[in-house]
């Protein structure tokens, strides 16, 4: 973690560490990979329906684009994986495919205990780790490995989707910036770039927006905007900024202006960027009150960010950041900072009140840039 008196860089570092604290950790990543590989093997070994059928299983949603966030006040993550069954959807009805997946999972004693069929997925509840929503689907066209028809067994229809296409669309936008502000700062200080600093500003901004969403709607989660709405809008309003703070502010400010200028009283459509015929915000048509909650959330988020920019001193900034993004992520970010300071001191480095890090062994000092805060 970076230690600097530059307020903009220090804020950037704190935001990144807070987002990292709320994301899927390496241990659960490993368990997730093990879980969906086991599911794939169990289906493929089916002697009745799936035996001999090619099955590809892969993550979708936040897992695939690097924007996972733990639900507020809970220990389990909500994660999605796709079971891409290489059978043409035109040859089967969705209910048959869905029921065969449920049937096969229930033949396994472990899965039977944690299996919960939903409308479009089968949820596997891995206690203390994550809820894994397994989404079955079939090929639309032979040799097209992105397009998929997923099952909606409740309405007995196929729903066109492209999880891989959406992943590519989002990551192409996120990767418009080659080096993040944190990467450049690490390099300027001739320090090895830590992994948390390499995640793109758009990914971090989406994580932070969802973290604030989870807290804001904690008492009424049914009113919260979906992650796909927030993620898609964030990517559409992103302009390639290299810092998390500029990305966050740019997205929220542009979105607020978009609403006030064009859609103050009625919901707007949000076409799926990889399937334009699908309106990702169709729920606002059926439940317009949810759009009002969305507007209130964006306005509140904008106002809170402006307050954070005007914060005077560490204590005020801490109160605002914990209120926006959660107490635990902030504490973990500060613990990481304290650990870094202790390591530097143990290596013979001292940090002066001026923000200069001193190497006492060779009596050299590394100056830190003047104190400037983003937006001032």
UniProtKB/Swiss-Prot annotation:
Molecular function as annotated in GO: diguanylate cyclase activity; GTP binding
Keyword Acyltransferase carried by entry: no
Catalytic function, reaction form: 2 GTP = 3',3'-c-di-GMP + 2 diphosphate
Keywords: Antiviral defense, GTP-binding, Nucleotide-binding, Nucleotidyltransferase, Transferase
Pfam families for the chain: SMODS
Record has Cytoplasm as a keyword: no
CDD domains: NT_2-5OAS_ClassI-CCAase
InterPro entries: NT_2-5OAS_ClassI-CCAase
Superkingdom assignment: Bacteria
Gene Ontology biological process terms from the UniProt entry: defense response to virus
EC numbers on record: 2.7.7.65
Known role: Cyclic nucleotide synthase (second messenger synthase) of a CBASS antivirus system. CBASS (cyclic oligonucleotide-based antiphage signaling system) provides immunity against bacteriophage. The CD-NTase protein synthesizes cyclic nucleotides in response to infection; these serve as specific second messenger signals. The signals activate a diverse range of effectors, leading to bacterial cell death and thus abortive phage infection. A type I-D CBASS(GG) system.
Further facts: Bacteria with this enzyme do not have other c-di-GMP synthase enzymes (no GGDEF or EAL-domain containing proteins), suggesting this second messenger has been co-opted for CBASS signaling via STING activation.
Entry similarity comment: Belongs to the CD-NTase family. G05 subfamily.
Name assigned to this protein: c-di-GMP synthase
